[in-house]
Amino acid sequence: MPSDGLTLEKCMSAARSLRQQGMNKKAIEMYRQALQFDPENLEALNELGLAHIHIGEQSEAIFAFDLAIDIAPNDYRGYSNKAEAFLTLGAFEDANAVADTGLQLAPQSSELWIKKARALESLLKIQEAVDAYNEALKYDSSDPEVWKALALCLDAQQNWPAVARAYRIAAGLHEKRGEMQDADSCLKFAEMAEQS
């Protein structure tokens, strides 16, 4: 057990604060201290793994996510995070397989559909990636980055009207967030697609 008056809550709070500041190695130490209080804490395991990804320690991240999955095999977050680790490794088949396992548990998870789409796109399975992005958008259509990723896949298919539509939607979402430079960029891409 950690000493110095630390509690699980204090360790988690400190770890999250450090991670937000980009101090991932120090955050990892605090997550490890949190896990001394509760070795099966899913939040700590998942966040520990994400911190490992940010500093390029994918093997350690996958280990943390595997522990989370072993503890709670019906919680989709471990699968989503493990898929992210595989994506950052370039292990796209593995990322797709893990995303599929997670989707069996949470078929309406936009997050898992996006990870699947990214894996398929990287495997150059463009139509399958388009289908997966469209599934993600069924459950959460508020992220302009997903619309832009879809637009890139549609661009590879030279489906210009659909490319323009996706970029225009992304532009509108950026505009709502006050991200005018991103909105303008999306509008330019939409206009280019409309002229193709």
Where are these regions (language model features)?
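Helix-start (N-cap) detector for alpha-helical repeat units in TPR-like alpha-solenoids
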Residues: 8-9, 42-43, 76-77, 110-111, ...
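Structural signature of tandem alpha-helical TPR/SEL1-like repeats
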Residues: 21-32, 55-67, 89-101, 123-135, ...
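Alpha-helical segment of the N-proximal tetratricopeptide repeat
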Residues: 6-43, 47-54
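TPR/TPR-like (Sel1-like) alpha-helical repeat modules
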Residues: 138, 155-178, 188-191
